[in-house]
């Protein structure tokens, strides 16, 4: 299949989709012709609108049809071998080939979409689980989706997890830049001796030597060649030579680097190389033709036919409404980019930016200088190397010492000398036989003859004797036997012929002649016998030849690395390589550094071609910045009120009740009716009178409450400083490669950095008007730079991205354009940015265009702009109850609720040891209700003035018939309050009273934790009546409303406590009430801009107990409180010696809270406390003498008694519970301590208030007009200007503030009580509040401790009647020590007592004077090691660790970024990836690790590659699964695409913790506590595993924080596909740890089915804990 055909096939589905969209749009269009009876609304055509936002990128157009093949040309001459050609055109169809092998079965298709939900069934009973049914038939596979466009390249990833230091040996770093040349290192160790060099070339022959002494004339011998002798043994080393003269050279200077050497000889053949895998071979020959295939399936519908001839022009129809925005048009013809502007001047340096992310990997640096020499470490022995070349001859050695060697063997006989001159005539003495004369003198040496040929090597001689003392030269031996004749010599020079003399005898050996010059190098002699071995250390033999390679030795110890060699000289430039094939496309590069901003370019050439049609009015532009404030205008005219008749109003409120009618006759009693439906909950009745019952038993811990709504977002942070500009990289080499095939148009790339300014090119031919490109990415806003020098006037630049600037000047009139055909209806565009409140300036009127040709009727237009809001209607009547909807999105935070119920009272703790007397505390809260007192006795009571005791309650009588209503009597005067009777039974509920005056709303409570969205529950039965809440603080009286209808009878409230008050007088007529009932709850508004911090509110009611906060800083010292209870007197210690007071030092740093001190002695009597708050009671009569009471609280301590005698030492008591941290003590006397370490950096302070305005500056010189600046921030609102013209219809505004609170709904069923939270750490001490109003009288409290003596002006009661004499009381407890007595007389000196227990150490004395230095003692022996010291005091806080490396990931399961838990540090935010599925196999992420938090979201975040160097993206039926949010599914259940996916994907945060983090699971509905020494990070539900498509999935490690999700959902994740869609599917299951009762552990689990609303009752709870550091 050729490349063109494959493009056709790829684009065919896109064409069909477009065709389908077109037909759908046409069907929707409705009335588009002239038959619509609409009125003619043609008004005056408005002015030309602002330029709209750029449209979306168009789709890829259809490919053109393939042209016909041309005729075949004549063959040309044979040309040179050309470059490899482009792929040829598609050949003609060959004969059918043989049928191929059957293919592998295809991958399974994507599951089809779920059907719409059926009608709801009747809820059935919970049936038991049925048996597994037979497998159903497999469903039909769905259609495969279209491949999505390739995604944009991802940003460069962040550095990986820090898991501690990696040793440098394991990971090799990138090569660095060249270092500075190092200083020369010390001289290295001498190298090993090199091998012997090769023998030198043979030298030239030396000059002839002086003539030798004449030899004897030899016999003329025969010459024949003797046999070749054996090689002799190597001879003994010769005697040492004469010592040479040593010359000393001075040490040279540093060598300079030599010139480049000549090219060396070619090296030995290298080891075989390891090659890379070769490129794929050329295509093979075409295969055999295949057989005919089966008949093809029915083809796809054809392309639309050619358009028909145009119809007749119809009558002009009415103007249609503005249609929806059309789909993106096809890409326009791109006109070349304009020339780049000149490079701008270098700007002033910016302020240093914050520390950026780690930059991309740098380029390798130049090689550094050689390092210092390493220590030698022996390496392992290598394999034997190849034999090296023979070395050069070594230098001459030092002279050896001379020892005489043994005499050598006789040399070969020399050549015969010339014949000597004739001798003197002999002396005959007349005798014929002459006597031999004396030997003659040695003749002069003859002329040397020509050298003879070198003789053959003689036979091996006998081994010589070793000569021990060889001083005497031996005599010459006798002549040897005659040798064989030598070869014929060259003829000698002819001598003068003499007379032949008689041969003389041998002469005496002459003196040795001088040393001759060296002769020619002889042939090597035969190997001699081994000589005697004589060894002298000073003699050094000649270096032998290199041996053969030995066997590899044992590996040696590792040597230290050698010094680096000096850098080599640069080699010659290599020859250019062959042209390579084009490589695979590389991965996308990292994002480059942003370039500096270029200058504004010159204006482009004028456009070319006729002008286009006048476009629709554009969207309203971005509002301009606010203008400078105008002066306040004059007061306007009063507006005219045009009444508009509204729709009929809702039914009015009932009128006031009429006067009461006359009393009717009494009717007969009716038959009792059926019980009615449970009525609505009545209002809380008046509190009854009676004592409260005893407190009930402590309830079971309830479930934790839902999390409250999120708080208001914080103020936006400040912008960071700009980063430093990066280093510009080096220019790369130009690449070489063949041109590739033309690719499909790619998606728009990320805008590149601006290039440097090029030279201005020649203006090109004007191009056609291009389509508007896609909007660029929004850049990051930089900090404002320092003011630049005034530049020259720049030409207008391209429109920038960002807030709009001020309105530009009107443009010139363009040439008229042809009118284009109407476009297709587009998809709905993205919502625009919300505009500011002010309308923009009115635009200039555009020039009149030429009339265009009448176009065909267009598709329906965009919807019109939103009209102004109508006059609000009256509230409608209440509608029927609608179908239960799906859970809505979480609402904005509601008004703060009333304070919750008070928690259960805790058990009493053990009494702690009494501490020292503290400063008076603030006034405490109201105490708990006390237990009811014992019943009082009524003896000796004056019955005349007292109300009698109430009798026992009689049996309840039958309910009589209702009597007639009596007329109302006058109110009686209030009686004297009677004595309290015993508590009566609660009375029957009274009728519901008139509603009281509504109080002011209570102070807002703290926001509760955010609740998770519950599933849709079945309607529950009406809940029981809730417990009445605590009365709120008394509100200021409201204005009286109209009298309401009589309420239903309420249930009896709890009996109230208090004295009945007097009846008040009738109040005055109130003023009219505020406007009527609030309207319905408004839509959720957008989050407004955070306001300035408000003034502190009133003191709120107590909130519920929060999670434990970190301990606050100690508050300031409070006002003096009421006196505390005194401690038990301590045991008196021995008195220490008084120290002399030291000088007062500066106040030291605040210490840690100390442990409890030893109880002090009893304090002095305190001052009388403030009078208690309350009404004075009536004086009671004297009561009977009570029975002996329980031991009371200790009374106030008296003055210190006389010291008692010292008691025996008691046993150590059990340690008391840890007390609260004490208040800071008063400053002690201390010497100046050392300066402490710097504390950790504090939290950043609030931004300061703006400073005062500075004085006005000097007027500056008028600058040249600058370039257009970036839009500024919105200015402050100006003074109101004069009334402007009416503005255009604005963009939809930001959502309004929340409406007036709606009417109070019915009280919901009571929630499950939450667990009692752990006791919080003490908070910061608050500011003392204002004095509150008089509260409702509280319940009677527990008997308090004895109060301080009251003021003396209380009226003393009348004395009671004397009681009868009582029996003597029991012996009282030992009294407290009495008040201090008078000073006694000094007693006699007592007998000395036994020695006491040693006292505590006294205070340290002052430092003594320095004594004189003693003599130095002898050095002692070393002592034994001492015992371990005590643990030191806690050190200052350490510096924050950088390499904690404990990472924990937290998932919000909402669209908000989660906060890192307290004590951890944020690293980054991302999207919560649960697992991926590729090729039908799933791989999951641990939700507690950083791998589950991807920085970027994609429905297909991975691609797959094969062994053929091919990777595919979004081309297969793969899935990704992400944690989801509570966003409900759309009602259509259609897959979610595009930006609509964003609200469904959970966000996450990767945090760095200072210690290990783990999860603990309770397997109950209780939240498990963290182990000892661990603190809580968050609580949640125990999430174990999950499955989805193909029953594949993954799971969580239960020790990982990922197994503890903070919110429980039955479907906690969403499935996404490569085609860009996400949805929830019925085959997705989540698995959670269940709750297990201890008694059910080993029993068979009971099957059960839980419906919505009860799901959390069986899911285990968990907590994520971090080890405390």
Swiss-Prot record:
Glycan-modified residues: 126
Consequence of changing residue 525 to L: In HANAC; requires 2 nucleotide substitutions
Annotated positions of the 4-hydroxyproline modification: 603, 606, 623, 626, 629, 632
Proregion residues excised on maturation: 28-172
Keyword field: Angiogenesis, Basement membrane, Collagen, Disease variant, Disulfide bond, Extracellular matrix, Glycoprotein, Hydroxylation, Repeat, Secreted, Signal
Any coiled-coil regions, as ranges: none
SUPFAM superfamilies per record: C-type lectin-like
Gene Ontology CC entries for this record: basement membrane; collagen type IV trimer; collagen-containing extracellular matrix; endoplasmic reticulum lumen; extracellular region; extracellular space
Compartments, record wording: Secreted, Extracellular space, Extracellular matrix, Basement membrane
Compositional bias (Basic and acidic residues): 250-263, 289-298, 535-545
Biased amino acid composition, Pro residues: 196-214, 367-376, 413-424, 436-448, 1247-1258
Ranges where the record places region Disordered: 48-459, 504-1382, 1404-1431
Covalent cross-link S-Lysyl-methionine sulfilimine (Met-Lys) (interchain with K-1651), where: 1533
Notes on the domains: Alpha chains of type IV collagen have a non-collagenous domain (NC1) at their C-terminus, frequent interruptions of the G-X-Y repeats in the long central triple-helical domain (which may cause flexibility in the triple helix), and a short N-terminal triple-helical 7S domain. NC1 domain mediates hexamerization of alpha chains of type IV collagen.
Disease implicated: Hereditary angiopathy with nephropathy aneurysms and muscle cramps: The clinical renal manifestations include hematuria and bilateral large cysts. Histologic analysis revealed complex basement membrane defects in kidney and skin. The systemic angiopathy appears to affect both small vessels and large arteries. Brain small vessel disease 1 with or without ocular anomalies: An autosomal dominant cerebrovascular disorder with variable manifestations reflecting the location and severity of the vascular defect. BSVD1 features include cerebral hemorrage, unilateral fluid-filled cysts or cavities within the cerebral hemispheres, leukoencephalopathy, hemiplegia, seizures, intellectual disability, and facial paresis. Affected individuals may manifest variable visual defects and ocular anomalies.
Protein name: Collagen alpha-1(IV) chain
Organism, scientific name: Homo sapiens
